[in-house]
Amino acid sequence: MQLAVLTLALCWAYPVTIYISYLLSRLGIALYRKHKDSTTGAWYEKHRKAAFTAIFWLQLVQCFDLAISITITGYAMNISPQVEAWWVDKEFLASNIAVFMFLAAGLLPDPDVPFSPSLSHSHAWIAGIIMEALQLAMFCNQQSPVSVLSRVEYLQLGLVMVRLVLFVAMVALYFQPMYAWSRIQLDETEPLLGEVDSKPVRDAQHGGWLDYVVGFSTLFPFLWPSDSRRLQLRAIFCFVLLVIQRVVNILVPHQLGIVVAHLGSGTIPYQKIAIYIALRALQGQQGVIGSIRALLWIPVSQSTYRRLTSSAFEHVLSLSLEFHLGKRIGEVMSALSKGSALNTFLDGLVFQLFPMVADLWIAALYFLIQFDAFYSLIVITVTWLYLFVTIYMAKYRGRARREMVNREREMEAAKTDALMSYETVHHNSAVPHEINRFNRLVQAFQKAEYFVFFSLNLLNATQNLLFTAGVAIVCLLCAYQISADMQQVAMFVTLLTYLAQLQAPLNFFGSFYTQVQNNLVDAERMLALFKEKPLVQDRDGAIDLNTCAGRVEFTHVNFAYDERRPALQDVSFTVEPGTSTAIVGESGSGKSTILKLLFRFYDVAAGSVRFDGVDARDMTIASLRSHLGVVPQDTILFNDTLLYNLLYARPQATMEEVYAACRAASIHDRIMSFPDGYETKVGERGLRLSGGEKQRIAIARTFLRSPQILLLDEATASLDSQTERQIQGALDNIAKGRTTITIAHRLSTITKANQIIVLHQGRIVEKGTHEELLAANGMYSQMWAKQTKAKEKKDSNATLVEVA
């Protein structure tokens, strides 16, 4: 009796141990890989590939071995029932089938990588060694007499021994290249192996679902409503309702069987029918319990979406300027819109996938207890095949879906670029080119889309065929048992009802897995955004710059956007509080780079930038920027009213302050001439305003901000001469008592600057006042002479036109 219990336990423990070993190993490796990648070389890759080829053939032999063992067991159970041995049992048969499925699944081709068993597979093989050794001990413990029938038993014994040896060989082959490589790394003192190409190697099959889960763990804190106790209680109660739904799913077919069993008694079983109807009312997503759960979950789902999308938006705004300059706005916008994909994924995972898996395991256990192991085996086999085919085909569909999403992004990005560059497109008569370009991208998208839909229909047909085959086998088996008086008709009804219930979650899994893949592919870009780290951020212990006198110091500053091409080299200068400094030079000399460093869009590579003697890197970015006001060369306005754009600098400003700032910028009268005045819509990026109007709005906005340090990036470059003179006077007024740093193209606007810095190829070549630099007869003097000559020629031409 004790031996029989051990035998039964071994049969169930064998496949469970292998699968759990594999899954736990995958999870551990995924968590480890999140923090570290291993590095190997070309020698290791060559020998690893050879070892994997040998493992493939060994695993194939393993599958043949198990197939023979399954055949012998089935033969002994059905053709020669007089065979009495512990392995002639349904549990042993089920165990071998489960192990066969695991090994056979590993042999199927992967769409992304060639056959490459992972470290997790080796852990499962080690578990197989232990379990096969226990089976061998079971065989050796039998005391069957030698007879004709015992030859079959000894054949089974030989098959177990072969499997044990094969498992050991597979493990040895897997670890041998690793061991040899580690010895080479320890003993190597010179490059005897030739050139070694180091690269990160992942020993798990690429893109596994556990890797996805671990990768998305960055977003897990946004999924649980940790900021609301009320929402947490709602979520917990929803989980309780899920458990109740699982119980109801068992009771419905069981109660139907009871009703059918009592129908032949000559009386109507009203009570049992009422119980069945009540259970049916509670069952399913549209039942009473499911509806209550869905209503309770709505605020939890909304809270998750709000936290996720708001955090993503905040994170993108916190990223450094380099990220925004290097990304296409259409792609970033598309990624930010994928918060709903993760929200949908969470809802499906918690309330659809987990309940479905629970229902399938409960069904297998129910069939085992209520019927026998054959029914449980059939359910497990059909379920496994259904899920495996779904996941396996979804690997190909995932790649196709990713290709389709990439084509869609390119299509959307091209459309966004063309619309945002409307004037440029028409200036260059490029409308036909943009239309043809967009049409080509649409065709590429539809080609990828066709394969996605084709593979979906193929998957659905395969799933239906598998489930129909399983139902047919169960019906035939149950019908045979009923005809042999081994089961009652009521059990047939219960069986078919339960199978019908299982079809819904299985069919759902097909669509859900596809939906999950779509959601994860869609959300990959959002995850990538969260993984982006700002190059410039507050260091630990950074201080707040509460007050600022306005002293600015550049000390031996070096900086480069690309290390191969320095933008600034050994730049040093000081701007005293309340003084003005102008920076001039040819295009690409580094003028705008200095403003970017002042605003801390970038940090210096060497040297320091100091404000009132404090290194900019030692103060918080927000407090530093609160003392800076910028009038950029290219003003970008929000697609809102003029008033909104003006108040953006200081939302609490009064209308009188807004009017004063606009008068100082010579734009108030122009605004009042508009039909809607300050409520005039400026259009996308301010396209409804002229360049000069946008520039004056930017100047007025800076006046309203009233910073201690003014940064003017060719602030009057877009203005005509008359307006420039008006603005220049206003700029002189607001600059009194404030530090002003001006990037100038027109040298006539900076003649009164306390200090002029001349840049050439990232270096300071001259420094001084206007008069000093003219007297030096250097680069500044040449630039002045060139611009003066051009202005005189322009004025002369204008005079001739007036005379004519």
UniProtKB/Swiss-Prot annotation:
The chain crosses the membrane at residues 3-23, 52-72, 97-117, 119-139, 155-175, 206-226, 239-259, 349-369, 373-393, 464-484, 489-509. ATP binds at G585, E586, S587, G588, S589, G590, K591, S592. InterPro entries: AAA+_ATPase (IPR003593), ABC1_TM_dom (IPR011527), ABC1_TM_sf (IPR036640), ABC_transporter-like_ATP-bd (IPR003439), ABC_transporter-like_CS (IPR017871), P-loop_NTPase (IPR027417), Type_1_exporter (IPR039421). Keywords: ATP-binding, Glycoprotein, Membrane, Nucleotide-binding, Transmembrane, Transmembrane helix, Transport. Its main location: membrane. The keyword Membrane applies. GO terms for cellular component: vacuolar membrane. Residues 552-786 form the ABC transporter domain. It is found in: Membrane. SUPFAM superfamilies: ABC transporter transmembrane region, P-loop containing nucleoside triphosphate hydrolases. One of its GO terms (molecular function) is ABC-type transporter activity. It is a multi-pass membrane protein. Coiled coil: none annotated. Residues 236-518 form the ABC transmembrane type-1 domain. Glycans are attached at N460, N639, N797. Belongs to the ABC transporter superfamily. ABCB family. Heavy Metal importer (TC 3.A.1.210) subfamily. ABC transporter; part of the gene cluster that mediates the biosynthesis of aspirochlorine (or antibiotic A30641), an unusual halogenated spiro compound with distinctive antifungal properties due to selective inhibition of protein biosynthesis, and which is also active against bacteria, viruses, and murine tumor cells. This is ABC transporter aclQ. It comes from Aspergillus oryzae (strain ATCC 42149 / RIB 40).
